[in-house]
């Protein structure tokens, strides 16, 4: 128990002092003081479905919104403890690449680290522009929930996580999410839906080095996990707050990176969805 308390204190440490005073200096007639807190959403979808393109489009269309990107760079460059400055950082390796190369060896390590990095992102104090916004909106690129119900769950089902690793991961995941429940609330999911074949084509186009060994079968597995959770509602969930969160499903099978009309349609749907939350 002592070790658990120490772990929690360290996880809270970067945020606790800031979390007590994020509203200082904000007029009581503006921003969060004016009423409800930010509407918080998560963008979900398969590997290479187009999340990065979608995030850029969101940022351009709604600059007043805060969009937190997936911490992929952190996974690609694990730094030794105590070497926070980039110029002196000692890299311990590319964990994302290690996981794809040897999933049976590194999946548990990767999922533990990816979950913690996502949790830290969702625990960050609200940035100034959210505090000043009349209708604040915060959007995350994936969430602590998809970390478990999509990726970790799939790794267990395809044999990359052992029974004991899956049990331990779920235990930590549940404990930490219950501990921080009030600070990681989400109000909606935006599901970018595309076929595994389309995702594979886009994966080849972006040519991320770590992903060159990914096959269609893996993308089909992840597609099935997304559909079960967000469409068919057959995934067994362990958090009551997740049960009734609305889902906006956006068909992104057609390339929208250069198609202005498609972009406008997508942004219009997102705006309507957010307004109704």
From Swiss-Prot:
Write out the annotated subcellular location: Mitochondrion
Q: Name one Pfam family in it.
A: dNK
Instruction: State the UniProt keywords alphabetically.
Output: Acetylation, ATP-binding, Disease variant, Kinase, Mitochondrion, Neuropathy, Nucleotide-binding, Primary mitochondrial disease, Progressive external ophthalmoplegia, Transferase, Transit peptide
Reactions that this protein is recorded to catalyse: 2'-deoxyguanosine + ATP = dGMP + ADP + H(+); 2'-deoxyadenosine + ATP = dAMP + ADP + H(+)
Binding of ATP: at which residues? 45-53, 206-208, 254-256
SUPFAM superfamilies, per the entry: P-loop containing nucleoside triphosphate hydrolases
Oligomer status and interactors: Homodimer.
**Which disorder is recorded?**
Mitochondrial DNA depletion syndrome 3: A disorder due to mitochondrial dysfunction characterized by onset in infancy of progressive liver failure, hypoglycemia, increased lactate in body fluids, and neurologic abnormalities including hypotonia, encephalopathy, peripheral neuropathy. Affected tissues show both decreased activity of the mtDNA-encoded respiratory chain complexes and mtDNA depletion. Portal hypertension, non-cirrhotic, 1: An autosomal recessive disorder characterized by portal hypertension associated with hepatosplenomegaly, in absence of cirrhosis, extrahepatic diseases, and splanchnic venous thrombosis. Portal hypertension is defined by a portal venous system pressure that is at least 5 mm Hg higher than the pressure in the inferior vena cava. High pressure in the portal venous system leads to shunting of blood through vessels that are poorly suited to carrying large blood volumes, resulting in collateral circulation and splenomegaly.
What is the purpose of this protein?
Phosphorylates deoxyguanosine and deoxyadenosine in the mitochondrial matrix, with the highest efficiency for deoxyguanosine. In non-replicating cells, where cytosolic dNTP synthesis is down-regulated, mtDNA synthesis depends solely on DGUOK and TK2. Phosphorylates certain nucleoside analogs. Widely used as target of antiviral and chemotherapeutic agents.
Q: What is this protein called?
A: Deoxyguanosine kinase, mitochondrial
Q: Which organism is it from?
A: Homo sapiens
Q: What is the lineage of its organism?
A: Eukaryota, Metazoa, Chordata, Craniata, Vertebrata
């Amino acid at each position: 128990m002592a070790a658990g308390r120490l772990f929690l204190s360290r996880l809270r440490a970067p945020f606790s002092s800031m979390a007590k005073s994020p509203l200082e200096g904000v007029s009581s007639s503006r921003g969060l003081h004016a009423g409800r807190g930010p509407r918080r959403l998560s963008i979900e979808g398969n590997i290479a479905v187009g999340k990065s393109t979608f995030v850029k489009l969101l940022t351009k269309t709604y600059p007043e919104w805060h969009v937190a990107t997936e911490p992929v760079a952190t996974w690609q460059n694990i730094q030794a403890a105590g070497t926070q400055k980039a110029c002196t950082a000692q890299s311990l390796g590319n964990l994302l690449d290690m996981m794809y190369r040897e999933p049976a060896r590194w999946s548990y390590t990767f999922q533990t680290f990816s979950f913690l990095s996502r949790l830290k992102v969702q625990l960050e104090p609200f940035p100034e522009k959210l505090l000043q916004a009349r209708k604040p909106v915060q959007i995350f690129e994936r969430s602590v929930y998809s970390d478990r119900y999509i990726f970790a769950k799939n790794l267990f089902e395809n044999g990359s996580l052992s029974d004991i690793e899956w049990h331990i991961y779920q235990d930590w995941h549940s404990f930490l999410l219950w501990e921080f429940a009030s600070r990681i609330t989400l109000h909606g999911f935006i599901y970018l839906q595309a076929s595994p074949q389309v995702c594979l084509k886009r994966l080849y186009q972006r040519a991320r080095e770590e992903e060159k060994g990914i096959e269609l079968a893996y993308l089909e597995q992840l597609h099935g996990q997304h559909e079960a959770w967000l469409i068919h509602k057959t995934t067994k969930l362990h958090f009551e707050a997740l049960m009734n969160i609305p889902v906006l499903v956006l068909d992104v099978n057609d390339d929208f990176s250069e198609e202005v009309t498609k972009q406008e349609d997508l942004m219009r749907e997102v705006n309507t969805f957010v307004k109704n939350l």
